[in-house]
A protein has these predicted regions:
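Short, basic/aromatic recognition patches
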Residues: 1-19
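Short beta-strand segments
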Residues: 16-50, 69
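Conserved hydrophobic/aromatic beta-strand scaffold that supports enzyme active sites
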Residues: 19, 31, 84, 107-109, ...
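A structural signal for short, well-ordered beta-strand segments
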Residues: 36, 87-89, 110-112
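Structural motif
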Residues: 42-44, 66, 88, 114
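Short, structured beta-strand-loop surface elements
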Residues: 51-106
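C-terminal edge-of-domain segments
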Residues: 80, 93-138
């Protein structure tokens, strides 16, 4: 069973750009736009890019795997929607090509520990829940 709701999976499947936040060596956050795909077979978020292994986000995750990831948009007239995923990131050196042509071999994979979503069902109700172990919730 997926940690994501049906609406969350549908929303993530229809989006290609999100924002990844990592923790820098001095503890400061670093946020960048990234291309991604929801990996339904592993229930993870897979992030690819060009020269990913040379990036600050790649180095940050090597030091501290805690990340936050947000996908959001705005429908007219003013209907915000979003999914926020907090979790643990892994660096994989040989899976990026699975995202499509033009992506580096490297891939960042986020395993969710907390999911927050809003506006996916047309209401303003916030849905938040922990989905990982207590040790991962820090």
């Amino acid at each position: 069973m997926s940690v994501f709701s049906v609406l969350e999976r549908e929303y993530l499947g229809g989006q290609r750009l999100g924002r990844l936040a990592t923790v820098g060596p001095d503890g400061a956050p670093h946020v960048v736009p990234v291309s991604f795909a929801y990996n339904g077979s592993l229930d993870t978020i897979d992030i690819g890019g060009h020269a990913l292994a040379d990036s600050k986000k790649w180095r940050d995750i090597g030091r501290d795997p805690r990340v936050a990831f947000v996908v959001d948009d705005l429908l007219p007239p003013w209907r915000p929607r979003m999914v926020e995923i907090r979790g643990q990131a892994s660096r994989l050196g040989d899976a990026g090509a699975s995202l499509g042509p033009g992506f580096a071999d490297e891939l960042i994979r986020i395993t969710p520990t907390r999911i927050v979503s809003f506006g996916l069902d047309g209401t303003r109700d916030l849905r938040a829940r922990n989905v990982g172990s207590a040790a991962d919730q820090r």
